[in-house]
């Protein structure tokens, strides 16, 4: 029987970042409405000792469970759609480029790899990535989809379909009076975790990556309480009332689920200069020193003033609270 393959590197209850959140949204909102028989192929080993659950009825195969079947499914599919792929070349993609119908781009590696230079950080903390591959796979695919809010260099090289992610505001909490800063993100360079050094803060991230910053950038983080990231605890962390300012100062952020969560949970964020830059918002920073100044500025605000700033921006962000529109745009591509 003929079928389409949807290729990913993760998903289900195994969530490490925004791309996994995106895949789970796709499984819930798009997969049930696909017209053609389909399979989800996850190109990695299933984690040992972990039960990864999926909210979908679509057939799922992990590459590590049956490499031979995985390759057969890839090589014999009608169409291949990359939901989230690796940022370096792989022969399973290149040998099936004539089947490659679409690819979803979740981050601009071109911009992301420049973050260290832009922020003045001598050593780059980054996942394995090759910007040449991003361009190559985009040129192989019939359709290229970008999930972000702003244009990226790839827009100048290929035709790109812009389908920004969505976020549903379900909490709409008010700000509190805490001046403690919270950080809930991966520790790659463009997220600027070193901005927290010397600031009373909480960090909800990967402990191993956090130690990299202590070893390579000589951050002491003596005022930071560290909590190992586990996605099932994300809402508990944002719901805490012992922090009130969000370190959302992430450079070249494609969409920013964690930033939307900060607005949703009443954590007034400090943003980078480039995130929705057309919206007038006073609490932005580019350097570590500017970040500290903005922490001080917010600390001098009343709770009402914080709510006013947060509320105005949150209302603006509701334009991305559009789940049905988001899924319809993808279905138009996949069911065509």
Language model: regions and residue ranges:
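N-terminal strand-loop element at the rim of the active site
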Residues: 7-17, 21-67
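A charged, aromatic-enriched C-terminal amphipathic alpha-helix characteristic of glycosyltransferases
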Residues: 18-21, 289-292, 300-336
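Conserved active-site histidine-acidic residue motif and adjacent donor-binding/catalytic loop
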Residues: 63-69, 210-211, 215-216, 220-239
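Membrane-proximal helix-turn-helix segments that form the acceptor-binding/catalytic region
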Residues: 107-145, 239
């Amino acid at each position: 029987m003929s079928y389409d393959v949807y290729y990913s590197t993760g998903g289900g209850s195994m969530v490490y970042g925004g791309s996994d959140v995106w895949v789970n949204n796709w499984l819930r909102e798009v997969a049930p409405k696909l017209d053609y028989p389909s399979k989800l192929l996850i190109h990695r080993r299933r984690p040992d000792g972990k039960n990864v659950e999926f909210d979908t009825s679509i057939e799922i195969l992990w590459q590590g469970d049956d490499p031979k079947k995985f390759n057969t499914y890839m090589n014999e599919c009608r169409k291949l759609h990359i939901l989230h792929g690796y940022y370096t070349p792989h022969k399973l993609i290149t040998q099936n480029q004539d089947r490659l119908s679409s690819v979803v781009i979740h981050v601009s590696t071109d911009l992301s790899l420049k973050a260290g230079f832009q922020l003045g950080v001598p050593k780059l903390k980054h996942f394995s990535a090759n910007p040449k591959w991003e361009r190559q796979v985009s040129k192989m695919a019939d359709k290229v989809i970008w999930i972000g809010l702003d244009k990226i260099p790839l827009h100048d090289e290929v035709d790109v379909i812009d389908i920004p992610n969505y976020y549903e505001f379900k909490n709409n909490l008010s700000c509190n009076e805490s001046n403690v800063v919270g950080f809930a993100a991966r520790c790659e360079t463009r997220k600027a975790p070193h901005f927290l050094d010397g600031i009373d803060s909480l960090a909800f991230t990967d402990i191993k990556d956090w130690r990299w910053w202590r070893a390579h950038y000589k951050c002491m983080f003596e005022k930071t309480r560290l909590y190992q990231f586990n996605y099932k605890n994300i809402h508990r962390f944002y719901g805490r009332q012992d922090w009130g300012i969000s370190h959302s100062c992430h450079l070249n952020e494609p969409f920013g689920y964690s930033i939307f969560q900060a607005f949703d949970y009443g954590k007034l964020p400090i943003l980078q200069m480039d995130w929705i830059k057309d919206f007038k918002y006073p609490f932005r920073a580019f350097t570590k020193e500017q970040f500290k100044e903005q922490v001080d500025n917010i600390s001098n605000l009343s709770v009402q003033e914080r709510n006013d700033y947060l509320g105005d921006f949150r209302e603006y962000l509701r334009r991305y609270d559009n789940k049905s529109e988001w899924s319809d745009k993808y279905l138009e591509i996949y069911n065509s």
